[in-house]
Amino acid sequence: MRAWRYNAAMTQPISRFPVPRLDELPEDIRARILAVEEKAGFIPNVFMVLAHRPDEFRAFFAYHDALMLKEGRLSKGEREMIVVATSAANECHSCVIAHGALVRVYEKQPLLADQVATNYRKADITPRQRAMLDFAMKVALRSAEIEEADFARLREHGFSDEDGWDIAGIAAFFGMSNRIANATGMRPNDEFYLMGRVPRAR
């Protein structure tokens, strides 16, 4: 079985903590990781890093899926835009790179993720998406200042209060994820850098 201590280039460790081998993992976690590999063509390092703590792995991805895979007014691309903007504010290299790739894939705009990460206010986004990211950034950086006027602005752009909860939940969840990634020294896969920029190899 493969060892995942190092990234694809085999030059830097993907975590400062021990990274388990696939054959050491509980069956449910191994099955999930292999399913991701089948779909993506590689195993994102976040799965192997978090698998160091199986119970927390399960809890993390259960909440992740509840936020990111649910039906609602937020598209998959918009959810990922929230992750990229707030992760950039939290200076999480791993999350910006990995989720920036998903923004490019879902939105089919190769420049958008970089724009959102560096200054979403100047990105090629709609007024609705600007309002969404303004709210997400306030949750990420100044949540104690959130008031009814913030929800009123979301409503002006067609969001419901439940959508506001979704935006807040994503910003808050990935605030935790950013900090875990930074504390563990998690590195993004090399594959993420080119996703959505060049055609996927067949």
Residue ranges, per PLM feature:
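Hydrophobic alpha-helical segments
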Residues: R2-R202
